[in-house]
């Protein structure tokens, strides 16, 4: 694909002899370039000739080192090829490096993640049943402890380990979860969730003929979503009481990956991923208006690709969080007003609804 016309403008792409994408020019005129070495593996990403990251690889072409501003991230693998350690450190050449974060991972013989060790948030242990379903998680981060049980069809049940079984927490009729730990759900004839009621209030959902969610109504207001022909969300809007949209956020896509978002306050964020085929974020480049300078922010991710910290080019933390098992955050913090909405790979948090 050489050219892609989207609701937010035209993207153009260039490729080398091995069909590796070497450049993408975005509608705002900025160009992201990928440099490869002889075997066709990624060596550098730059934006308008400004280096975003450089990569060093081992004899198997696995990434073992990347630059992220004044920080560098080193990766180590176990004999099975699984990531066992990801250490981020600061330090100039000739200076003893200082560890910024250190993440270590342990696995079972069935490739189940058993333990993570995070230098800033402590240890987290995971427990599974014989079929590989997670049954409990214990973390030193905010003392998080949770457990789960399942029915014979694999549906999550509302009761926790050791909790007395009742009709409400032991049965999932027609494989539709009607209630789960204080949250109640209602469905339409297509099996789509049309209402969710919990301690934080009630949300109602409306869909189009393609089963895409196009509107959410909460106690705080109504929000509307616009899609393109490929089902990619191109815009979200807050709807005023008189039915008019405002506070529009627009989304630009590169294939099925979110490439850029433009927020109502005039700031755009360009997302850069660890390689052309990945959904794991590497960096975000913020820009105010057309003439504003680029501000590069770097993602530091867990083994599953979920962002745990963001740093600026000087290596200072601007955002951080931990995660519960299903993706809810633990003690999210922003330092300096940076909002970060990427979660698990391919997921984007709408803060106005919590979805």
Segments (PLM) and residue ranges:
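Beta-turn initiation residues at beta-strand->coil junctions
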Residues: 2-8, 23-29, 43-53, 65-71, ...
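A motif-centric feature for acidic-aromatic and gly/ser/thr-rich catalytic loops and repeats
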Residues: 103, 157-173, 284, 289-355
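Aromatic-rich beta-strand edge motifs centered on tyrosine
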Residues: 1, 10-20, 31-41, 52-62, ...
């Amino acid at each position: 694909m050489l050219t892609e016309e989207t609701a937010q403008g035209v993207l153009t792409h260039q490729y080398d002899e091995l069909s590796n994408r070497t450049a993408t020019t975005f509608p705002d005129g900025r160009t992201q370039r990928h440099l490869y070495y002889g075997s066709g593996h990624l060596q550098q990403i730059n934006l308008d000739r400004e280096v975003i990251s450089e990569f060093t690889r081992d004899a198997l072409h696995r990434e073992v080192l990347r630059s992220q501003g004044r920080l560098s991230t080193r990766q180590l693998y176990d004999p099975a090829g699984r990531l066992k350690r990801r250490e981020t450190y600061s330090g100039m050449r000739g200076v003893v490096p200082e560890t910024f974060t250190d993440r270590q991972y342990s696995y079972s013989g069935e490739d189940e993640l058993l333990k993570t060790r995070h230098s800033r948030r402590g240890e987290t242990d995971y427990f599974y049943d014989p079929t590989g379903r997670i049954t409990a998680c214990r973390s030193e981060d905010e003392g998080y402890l949770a457990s789960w049980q399942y029915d014979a069809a694999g549906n999550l049940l509302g009761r926790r380990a050791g909790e007395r079984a009742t009709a409400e927490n032991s049965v999932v009729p027609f494989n539709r979860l009607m209630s789960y730990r204080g949250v109640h759900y209602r469905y339409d004839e297509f099996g789509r969730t049309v209402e969710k009621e919990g301690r934080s209030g009630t949300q109602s959902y409306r869909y189009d003929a393609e089963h895409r969610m196009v509107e959410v109504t909460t106690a705080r207001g109504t929000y509307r979503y616009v899609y393109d022909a490929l089902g990619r969300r191109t815009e979200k809007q807050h709807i005023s009481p008189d039915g008019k949209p405002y506070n529009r956020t627009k989304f630009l896509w590169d294939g099925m990956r979110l490439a850029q978002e433009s927020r109502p306050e005039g700031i755009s964020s360009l997302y850069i991923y660890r390689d052309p085929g990945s959904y794991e974020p590497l960096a975000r480049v913020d820009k105010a208006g057309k003439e504003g300078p680029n501000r590069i922010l770097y993602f530091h991710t867990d083994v599953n690709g979920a962002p745990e910290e963001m740093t600026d080019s000087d290596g200072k933390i601007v955002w951080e969080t931990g995660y519960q098992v299903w993706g809810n955050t633990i003690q999210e913090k922003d330092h300096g007003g940076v909002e970060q909405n990427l979660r698990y790979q391919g997921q984007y948090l709408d803060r106005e609804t919590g979805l």
